[in-house]
Regions:
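Bacterial N-terminal signal peptides that target proteins for export
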Residues: 1-11
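Bacterial N-terminal signal peptides
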Residues: 10-18
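Glycine/proline-rich, flexible active-site/cofactor-binding loop segments
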Residues: 21
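Long, charged/polar, soluble alpha-helical segments
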Residues: 25-175
């Protein structure tokens, strides 16, 4: 029931995690990458920065929306600027940062999945105790809700880490 709410987030994070410079090299149709794409890049970076700030400030819905929009813009850049990106190799520092971001994203996603599992278990316990122990029922429900919210935040954070790699890959557009 509630797990299905988080599956698109989890799947989206996996999709973003899988995208890297090597995938960009597989683009078949060369497209021109020009000044309009630099504008898209700057907009995506601004959205990503704002999403991170909103998430830190506790505005989860806004953070999710902005991360999703940034992801859409980076997807456009991948489709249209992929061939040019393939000609540019990442530096050692960028490769190292890419690995760090991938690990952080995977860690956040794993923690989100653990929180979802724990929250589902607490929800099941609460349902069993609803009629016999209403105080314990309410306690489990509050804890489950808090864990679901924390899992949601962590999955968004995972997506932001993954999108930071796209920011790095297309950084040449801002120069």
């Amino acid at each position: 029931m509630i797990r299905s709410q988080f599956m698109p987030i989890v799947l989206g994070a996996f999709l973003v995690l899988g995208l890297s410079g090597s995938v960009l090299a597989q683009q078949k149709t060369p497209a021109k990458c020009g000044p309009d794409h630099a504008i898209l890049y700057k907009r995506a970076v601004k959205l990503l920065d704002n999403a991170e700030k909103k998430l830190t400030a506790g505005y989860t819905a806004e953070a999710k929306s902005q991360a999703k929009e940034a992801n859409s813009l980076f997807t456009i850049l991948q489709k249209e600027c992929g061939p040019q990106q393939a000609d540019r190799a990442l530096t050692d520092k960028e490769l190292q940062q890419e690995a760090i971001n991938q690990k952080l994203a995977a860690d956040e996603l794993a923690q989100a999945e653990r929180l979802i599992k724990s929250a589902e278990e607490k929800t099941q316990k609460a349902v069993k105790l609803e009629t016999t122990q209403p105080e314990v029922y309410l306690k489990y429900q509050r804890e489950a809700k808090a864990e679901f919210e924390q899992a949601h935040k962590r999955s968004i954070k995972s997506e932001i880490y993954a999108l930071r790699n796209q920011q790095m890959v297309f950084g040449w557009l801002s120069k």
